[in-house]
């Protein structure tokens, strides 16, 4: 599987993120979960708009334009020969010192993963499944 990582397509085994990336250390970043149906990325423009809004909310400067993110997302799917998939587009604050200061992270990181989606087994569609609801607010 090919992964988009900071401007390059690399094999998933070679896709490395630093342990000093603030996305890993502090959850400092934004992401979108997107679907690919019959070779078409579902509502990509709306997803990218929401990604920009989320980044702005945490004062994270996206390192790519909306068109560049769109092209990279579509190319990730193409490189993997996918027509139906789940796409995860992630932008992290990037590598920095320990500590919460975002200005110590000079370069945001971008990675995009697209993979064949594994949905529920057929028996769940035929028979349903048990669920639980909880009052936790997100």
What are these language model-derived features?
Residues 1-138:
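Conserved alpha/beta cores of soluble small-molecule-handling proteins
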């Amino acid at each position: 599987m090919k992964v988009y990582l900071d401007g390059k397509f690399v094999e998933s085994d070679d896709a490395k993120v630093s342990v000093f990336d603030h996305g890993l250390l502090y959850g400092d970043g934004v992401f979108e979960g997107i679907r690919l149906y019959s070779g078409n990325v579902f509502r990509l423009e709306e997803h990218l708009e929401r990604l920009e809004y989320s980044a702005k909310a945490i004062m994270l400067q996206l390192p790519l334009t909306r068109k560049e993110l769109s092209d990279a997302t579509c190319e990730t799917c193409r490189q993997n020969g996918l027509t139906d998939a789940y796409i995860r587009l992630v932008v992290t604050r990037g590598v920095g010192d320990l500590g919460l200061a975002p200005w110590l992270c000079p370069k945001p990181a971008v990675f995009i993963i697209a993979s064949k989606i594994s949905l529920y087994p057929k028996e769940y569609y035929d028979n349903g499944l048990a669920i639980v609801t909880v009052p936790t607010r997100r």
